[in-house]
């Protein structure tokens, strides 16, 4: 094993349930994230040599510093990962370690689930490698505890090898990325760097500086309930209004029909009765004009329906969540060019593609710190079929070390 503590560190982290809660109004959204930061990560950060390690209870970020040991390396680089995991069972995570994977199915614990290369052809990229999987009852949490483990391991390596020269390094572990609010209260003044990287990507080589622009859409439908036996010309069924609204959106502009640079409307929840219904959507697109056009379209649909109904029964609430960070990063591509150079020197082919999602880096970039995203190794994230390659995690550590030594 290239880095002795990497695997054990990762296993320790994923066994802690840090699932975030979209319905919470606190920061972090769950107490377990704060406990993870204070009882596990903070003591470890101090033990491996990070300085000024402190937790901010206002924004839920745990931050530490490793000062430069060569004054000629004047850049300051940050590394960021998130502590929370996605909306899937994260209680009693019991990872499996598959040494020297030789292809074929991987049975997930004693469950009836398996990782099958026919369903998940990405498994074929990992022949001969050590894979960490779930037992079929939980997610794994490689998103983003692989990133945390990689950053910690890189710092540990640097402090144990003081002859290796490096620039100033800032480390931040934050909450609630999976529910889209993790960076809302991020304090740039507490993270003085020239640029940063989120270690929150997927397979080997990912280097990303384009994200979706994102909005949340809540639509409330107000009906009028009367006895169905006497409902003619009187009842207005809120559920039918919701169906009508949904059918007016482009049917092929949904996640299951789109890829690459294509945006979408995604219905994530629908509840209600005849009297009142509520539909929740997320809206995503890469180009600013297309993003704005999607929001205008839903407003126009609501206005048209209300005009037809003769009163306001379709109420739209739109909230922007984050924006495509390409707009910021393209102004100064130093972070991207440095990462490309380091990867190529390590014989890693940079895979520069848009993220069909977002990262904390999206918001942080617009706060003034360009923050692209680098691979952390996770595959099939957010569910029971999640896995990660130990060798890919090791390569991520290599990249972190390469970045701070080349700066």
From Swiss-Prot:
**Where Zn(2+) 2 is bound, by residue?**
143, 178, 382
Role noted for this protein = Cleaves the N-terminal amino acid of tripeptides.
Protein name per Swiss-Prot or TrEMBL: Peptidase T
The note on cofactor binding and number reads: Binds 2 Zn(2+) ions per subunit.
PANTHER family referenced in this protein's UniProt entry, alphabetically? PEPTIDASE T
EC assignment: 3.4.11.4
Cellular component terms (Gene Ontology): cytosol
- Give one GO molecular function term: tripeptide aminopeptidase activity
* Pfam families given in the database record: M20_dimer (PF07687), Peptidase_M20 (PF01546)
> Quick check: keyword Zinc in the entry?
yes
Which amino acid positions bind Zn(2+) 1, per UniProt? 82, 143, 200
Provide the primary localization: cytoplasm
Cofactors demanded by this protein: Zn(2+)
Q: Which family does it belong to?
A: Belongs to the peptidase M20B family.
The signal peptide annotation in the UniProt record is none
EC primary class? hydrolase
Q: What is the lineage of its organism?
A: Bacteria, Bacillati, Bacillota, Bacilli, Lactobacillales
Q: Which UniProt keywords apply?
A: Aminopeptidase, Cytoplasm, Hydrolase, Metal-binding, Metalloprotease, Protease, Zinc
Question: Which InterPro entries does this UniProt record tie to the protein?
Answer: ArgE/DapE_CS, Bact_exopeptidase_dim_dom, Peptidase_M20, Peptidase_M20_dimer, Peptidase_M20B
Q: Which reactions fall under this protein's catalytic activity?
A: Release of the N-terminal residue from a tripeptide
Residues of the active site: 84, 177
Q: Which domain of life is it from?
A: Bacteria
Any single biological process term in GO: proteolysis
Q: Which HAMAP family match?
A: Aminopeptidase_M20
The record's subcellular location field reads:
Cytoplasm
